[in-house]
């Protein structure tokens, strides 16, 4: 058996050793997991480990859980408006009772063709006055 045979045998033995080591480590890991799952729940150590495996961030002070409402709520509180200098002109004019849209009923339509045209004109006038972009409907207009 020459040098080539010794090298080939050592490579085969090292690969076999890696397979055996991998199998032993998998077996140990599965036994450990099985023992952890069937361990007594009253055991403080196993329950802490299990809680950590369920949520690894639970003991971290940097992690703060947000529910869906907190995550998507982008409304600004009125108390926060007082701390924003750029919002100060709007604070005096904010009111939840001031609507953006004019809620008055449109004028009744007339039946003649001429009055129908004037009715359409009145309708566009009421649409303009009901627009939230019209200055007199804006709650932020300073009078």
From Swiss-Prot:
Residues 97-143 are annotated as: Disordered. The chain crosses the membrane at residues 4-24. It is a single-pass membrane protein. It comes from the Eukaryota. Keywords: Golgi apparatus, Membrane, Transmembrane, Transmembrane helix. The keyword Iron does not apply. GO terms for cellular component: Golgi apparatus; Golgi membrane. Residues 110-143 have a biased composition (Polar residues). It is found in: Golgi apparatus membrane. This is Uncharacterized protein C607.07c. It comes from Schizosaccharomyces pombe (strain 972 / ATCC 24843). The lineage of its organism: Eukaryota, Fungi, Dikarya, Ascomycota, Taphrinomycotina.
């Amino acid at each position: 058996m020459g040098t080539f045979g010794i090298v080939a045998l050592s490579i085969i033995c090292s690969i076999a050793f890696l397979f055996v080591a991998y199998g032993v480590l998998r077996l140990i890991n599965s036994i450990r997991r099985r023992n952890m799952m069937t361990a007594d729940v009253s055991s403080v150590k196993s329950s802490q480990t299990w809680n950590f495996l369920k949520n690894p961030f639970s003991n971290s002070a940097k992690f703060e859980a947000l529910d869906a409402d907190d995550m998507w709520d982008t409304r600004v509180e009125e108390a926060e408006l007082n701390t924003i200098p750029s919002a100060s002109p709007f604070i005096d004019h904010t009111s939840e009772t001031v609507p953006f849209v004019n809620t008055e009923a449109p004028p009744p339509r007339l039946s003649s063709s001429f009055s129908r045209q004037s009715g359409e004109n009145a309708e566009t006038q009421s649409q303009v006055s009901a627009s939230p972009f019209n200055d007199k409907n804006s709650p932020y207009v300073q009078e």
